[in-house]
Amino acid sequence: MRLPLLLVFASVIPGAVLLLDTRQFLIYNEDHKRCVDAVSPSAVQTAACNQDAESQKFRWVSESQIMSVAFKLCLGVPSKTDWVAITLYACDSKSEFQKWECKNDTLLGIKGEDLFFNYGNRQEKNIMLYKGSGLWSRWKIYGTTDNLCSRGYEAMYTLLGNANGATCAFPFKFENKWYADCTSAGRSDGWLWCGTTTDYDTDKLFGYCPLKFEGSESLWNKDPLTSVSYQINSKSALTWHQARKSCQQQNAELLSITEIHEQTYLTGLTSSLTSGLWIGLNSLSFNSGWQWSDRSPFRYLNWLPGSPSAEPGKSCVSLNPGKNAKWENLECVQKLGYICKKGNTTLNSFVIPSESDVPTHCPSQWWPYAGHCYKIHRDEKKIQRDALTTCRKEGGDLTSIHTIEELDFIISQLGYEPNDELWIGLNDIKIQMYFEWSDGTPVTFTKWLRGEPSHENNRQEDCVVMKGKDGYWADRGCEWPLGYICKMKSRSQGPEIVEVEKGCRKGWKKHHFYCYMIGHTLSTFAEANQTCNNENAYLTTIEDRYEQAFLTSFVGLRPEKYFWTGLSDIQTKGTFQWTIEEEVRFTHWNSDMPGRKPGCVAMRTGIAGGLWDVLKCDEKAKFVCKHWAEGVTHPPKPTTTPEPKCPEDWGASSRTSLCFKLYAKGKHEKKTWFESRDFCRALGGDLASINNKEEQQTIWRLITASGSYHKLFWLGLTYGSPSEGFTWSDGSPVSYENWAYGEPNNYQNVEYCGELKGDPTMSWNDINCEHLNNWICQIQKGQTPKPEPTPAPQDNPPVTEDGWVIYKDYQYYFSKEKETMDNARAFCKRNFGDLVSIQSESEKKFLWKYVNRNDAQSAYFIGLLISLDKKFAWMDGSKVDYVSWATGEPNFANEDENCVTMYSNSGFWNDINCGYPNAFICQRHNSSINATTVMPTMPSVPSGCKEGWNFYSNKCFKIFGFMEEERKNWQEARKACIGFGGNLVSIQNEKEQAFLTYHMKDSTFSAWTGLNDVNSEHTFLWTDGRGVHYTNWGKGYPGGRRSSLSYEDADCVVIIGGASNEAGKWMDDTCDSKRGYICQTRSDPSLTNPPATIQTDGFVKYGKSSYSLMRQKFQWHEAETYCKLHNSLIASILDPYSNAFAWLQMETSNERVWIALNSNLTDNQYTWTDKWRVRYTNWAADEPKLKSACVYLDLDGYWKTAHCNESFYFLCKRSDEIPATEPPQLPGRCPESDHTAWIPFHGHCYYIESSYTRNWGQASLECLRMGSSLVSIESAAESSFLSYRVEPLKSKTNFWIGLFRNVEGTWLWINNSPVSFVNWNTGDPSGERNDCVALHASSGFWSNIHCSSYKGYICKRPKIIDAKPTHELLTTKADTRKMDPSKPSSNVAGVVIIVILLILTGAGLAAYFFYKKRRVHLPQEGAFENTLYFNSQSSPGTSDMKDLVGNIEQNEHSVI
């Protein structure tokens, strides 16, 4: 169900208008007359209802969370179990224990469970979660009959700020205070803002609210010629539907362009931008052509060459400033900026008549309507020019059509026929792609056919026809001989003579066999019906499209909004009936109608003229009465004939005229909605339409007879247009509904077809039309069905010899086995492919439909990766310019869902931990190497680690926690590791475990690993997404050896440390415990590893001892003697650390090794021959086997016994130690200047400009103007931070950075930082003249390009060190400027400006590099510590639409 946004507030907010907040409600139990009362966060009870009590007010703050207005906390439970208390918790959108849903009109329950919101069953004071659904579990909104979900949440999209248009997160925390509404707190200019994450204090992400407040008009640009206002949201990144909603939240719409002047103005307004911006043009309607979302006429075309593309799914249009502001159609799910519009661009004073019954007198054979006369010339076929000449000779012109009412008049009263194709006056002969009426009147209305206007095949289709049953329009070549419609003004100048039409009384209007009268008194539905009855008439019925067209033309031009018809469902909810005993044969619902609430039906006027809405029956409106005209012969009653029969295997009821048949098929034979409809039509029928309960019961009997319980079947329901509701494919009226609760909801804006669930409820659901389902056909009784059509061969695409499916230029492999992502990708690579990258809607549909038809697993890995900084990348390097996320995804659950799967039931995508086994899809090009060829082995590349990190198996590891202050909880530890460019350790095998144990020798703590079961209890996964192929649980773990800790709370895993014989083993622990932790990163090919410290005599230090592996085979006693000769002893292994070290020493020898344990010398008791007590052992299974023997360390790391006269390598032992440190964080704050948003990270502040592109020199100058320089990137952490910040802007631009090449060919940073880190794209740097460097927003990699290119840019400056408290800094901007030390000194800044001016004036980089060598340093800029305080004297306009709030602090732990 779609819910309107109610952006109004209950209290005065500075700068806002005082309005009642209708989002708030009281939760009311009608049976017991009590309301829910939040007494405290731990006590949610009931009390006598009091609308003024804050403690009783609640509000939806997400699709599934309910917040207490008093406490700014959300209703939740500790677990999903029966009879637990419902209390208040800090709102967490990811918590399953805070997600609520309406189960029906009264039941509220925890999502996904039959556990309900309950009070009073067992005399508890608190509200409880309870399995019962009795009277105490039934709730409404106080003062209404509405259910709790009727005041549902709708996202509020932000403007400007630094969150790319993200939605407000309510409640959000600012300066340790929670806000449930937009606020001006922290701002002196009164601008209303919100946080876009729940914790602004940490994340520093925000935007301005789409509300009216003082200064908000400065967000708009007003065209001085037309007074129309435009808002350019270039910094946002939203889908088309999100962008439209954002405009609507400001009482505006996505841009429509109807005049050449308007396009010219907008071209200039967006000239400095380079990325596409959504506009309102779309082809989302199934039944009509290109249209503007604000219903403006589509009369001006400005397509980019090659557009509009006919590719399926590209239904929304963007204006591309980088391509001369031309238009191109794209998939609506792409994320772009957008343009909103307020006002009307029409410059003409033309007035559409406000009534249809103005005085009109016409010549013979002409028909009057609203002051004009009309005539169809159907039989005189003429080319457009000759038709125009004929109309003008008759005193008129080819018809112009200015409203839906006028179009409906032509269809219903002028004798128009469905097979007509008639010239109208619209054409673009005078100005190509700019349609005008030949009579000179302005174009105020268009109604194009699907795919029109087309200018097909670049032909000159300059003239327009109307055709088809609905009279919609298409452009055609003007030389076709066709019929035509003429129109002229009424010739009468005198007062109207009211004519009484034959068969009707005075004041009534005749149409065909009926008389109609407009009731001029505002009345309720019952009053209107009684008034009509008093006139021996009844509230109007509407029998078909043509009567609807007549009534639209009859009342549509009137100023009143609604006119009652005789339709309602007040007798039986969901079944609409006329007030007279007449069958409902036609419906014409408005969008989202008829909905779930019972009511009475009224017909709209105005821009939605003729569409039907369901209103409360006690509302007052005017109405239309109807009766049979006098003298009209009523149609004879049908003669009684034997009822026709249905075919043998079809079902019917005696009260319906239809026969139905189920087609319940196997997975391979199911069909899409369109395929099912075509199948039924090939039989001579259609998909089933259900018009009453009798027909529904007939279908239920067929389901029970065939045993098709719980199967899903297509019905003929389809959503024809965004401006209309559901219709039946056979054209029958939607007079009966049986939607499931909460349906139709148009999930993800792709659910346009209806299905029926084969259970006793027989409920309906809207779903994607491309889904594969069973289906139900219908035919008329007495009709013999035609033979069933032969299945199309395209359902079985060709397959290669090795089992890959061929589709277009690629081959695909669909696995039946489940693997981790690493294993899945390895399989694809071995077969010369990779995990699939999906580049378009059509490719996704192919994959989705294939897995649906072929025994699909529930989900399949695809090749999309999500990095730790939430950037997206295809594994094969393809650009990410198409995504198809499921609702609420990606949700980055537990921050470790870095892989992506495609759901087989919908085709939408979900982020998931890479280590969770799934099926997968591989992809390779048709030209790839034959699969029988051996895949070449890539040579290993030498690599190393940073200082302080330990290298092993091409990875780097570091253990933290040796100092108490280093220890963290699991989440903090993971953030710290991510900040190093890695993650918490994932241990893949015994050798890696031994390496880590070896390095924990001096620990006194246990250390976090990446293993956890946070997302799914008892399913342990590595947080970096690697598969769980090895475990090393300690005794009793996981889930054992708890004291007061509950099993459910122990979700994270540590390696046991300290002086324990189980050191190195794993145990699960509570994630918020403070522990050490182990970070892991990839090794760096640019680094080398220092050799192990080996003493001159071949011994290696470890702990307080030194060891030497003797690589010669001796018997045990010979080995002991040899060690003594070398001033050592045969090695004892006293703890798990030494065991790990010793085993690692054997790694390259592949030989067994004697150790000092022996029972041969000590009366069959195993002891260490160096006299250490045996406190630790690591026996293999079934060991020790021998009573009197010597012990060796085997290749698997375990101890085994052997006769002492066998010969093995041996380990000698003698006796030292090593420390570790961690770098400190840097303090400071960022400046505020002219609404420029600086983003802090470590010791610097960054400004990202994506809307105004510059060449490299201009960008340098812009940064200098702000007291900064083009960014220097000096570490992987800094690179990751910037990549994360610019990735949402990838649809807009790439960004200049401060790296350049001087005349000597040396790469230098503009601020003289050393070039110690680079992140070149593959194949870069390249080109002799490409001397400046840009960062790719989509990948974070760098490319060197020509300095004259226009890009966005990133500025960087040091943080300001200022010890003043925040409250002392809340001064005016004037005060700020007085103390602002950021202005560059004239001598320093002058040099830099001269350098850049040389570049700008063509003196070239050579001169610039000359000045560069003089090492100009930029001074710091002063500003406020709390950068939400701006204190500007004027608000920014579109000409300066830079991000308006600074200090958006990236979480330090996430990137360091």
From Swiss-Prot:
Disulfide bonds join C35-C49, C74-C91, C168-C194, C182-C209, C247-C340, C316-C332, C391-C486, C463-C478, C532-C625, C600-C617, C646-C659, C680-C777, C753-C769, C828-C922, C899-C914, C977-C1079, C1052-C1071, C1123-C1212, C1190-C1204, C1263-C1355, C1332-C1347. CDD domains: beta-trefoil_Ricin_MRC1, CLECT, FN2. The chain crosses the membrane at residues 1390-1410. Glycans are attached at N104, N344, N529, N926, N930, N1160, N1205. Residues 1411-1456 are cytoplasmic. Residues 22-142 form the Ricin B-type lectin domain. The C-type lectin domains, also called carbohydrate-recognition domains or CRDs, 1-3 have at most very weak affinity for carbohydrates. C-type lectin domain 4 shows the highest affinity binding and has multispecificity for a variety of monosaccharides. At least 3 C-type lectin domains (4, 5, and 7) are required for high affinity binding and endocytosis of multivalent glycoconjugates. This is Macrophage mannose receptor 1. It comes from Homo sapiens (Human). The lineage of its organism: Eukaryota, Metazoa, Chordata, Craniata, Vertebrata. The gene is MRC1.
